[in-house]
């Protein structure tokens, strides 16, 4: 958004009907037949270093809070209620602190309390933790310039342990993201960012 303290995201997941699916009719097998749309938002309550250099950033966020009923009709439903499509509903309060290592990079430490209320999944109220390291070598060679686009990540998201990386190709406008969810399930993609400010 145009406000540095507010982040809003729209996620559209295309659903592929696999051959032999018992949910989708046979004529749709092998095709993308549906989509799941979700919004998320993060509100920065406190900026890192506002009061003292050591103070962390504090963020309040939500993912996939409501959807239209899966049977049509246009009514809004939330969380694990009957008829919802909220497969990623969660609310969280997060704290983040970054430490700079001159001519090497920046280490981020993150902790949150998460309330998960997604449809068809275990509901939980528990902490999550993460860490990342973004390289920041002096740009004296092509290798150090290339390494500076790399951000290594690891997390416990209140349900699973995940490891991955993000690589920025062009000034944080185009990023490659890859992850092993629960240490074994690969997911990846390209992220295109539009900076409004």
Q: What name fits each language-model region?
A:
Residues 88-91, 96-97, 106-116:
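Active-site cradle of extracellular carbohydrate-active enzymes
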Residues 70-75, 104-108, 121-124:
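A short secondary-structure junction signal
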Residues 10-12, 58-64, 109-115, 152-158, ...:
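Transmembrane beta-barrel strands of outer-membrane/channel proteins
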Residues 149:
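Active-site lining segments that contact anionic ligands and/or coordinate catalytic metals
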Residues 1-5, 37-48, 60, 91-101, ...:
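Feature captures outer-membrane beta-barrel proteins of Gram-negative bacteria and organelles
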């Amino acid at each position: 958004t145009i406000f540095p303290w507010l982040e809003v995201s729209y996620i559209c997941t295309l659903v592929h009907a696999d051959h032999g699916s018992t949910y989708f009719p046979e004529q749709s097998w092998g095709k993308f037949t549906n989509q799941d749309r979700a919004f998320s938002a993060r509100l920065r309550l406190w900026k890192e270093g506002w009061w003292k250099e050591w103070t962390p950033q504090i963020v309040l966020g939500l993912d996939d809070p409501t959807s239209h009923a899966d049977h049509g009709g246009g009514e809004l439903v939330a969380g694990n209620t009957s008829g919802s499509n909220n497969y990623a509903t969660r609310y969280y309060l997060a704290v983040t602190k970054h430490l700079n290592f001159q001519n090497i990079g920046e280490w981020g430490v993150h902790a949150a309390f998460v309330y998960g209320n997604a449809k068809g999944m275990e509901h939980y109220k528990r902490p999550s933790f993460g860490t990342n390291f973004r390289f920041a070598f002096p740009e004296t060679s092509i290798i150090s310039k290339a390494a500076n686009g790399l951000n290594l990540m690891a997390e416990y998201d209140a349900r699973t342990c995940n490891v991955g990386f993000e690589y920025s190709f062009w000034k944080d406008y185009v990023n490659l993201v890859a992850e092993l969810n629960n240490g074994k399930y690969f997911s990846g993609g390209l992220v295109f960012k539009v900076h409004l400010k």
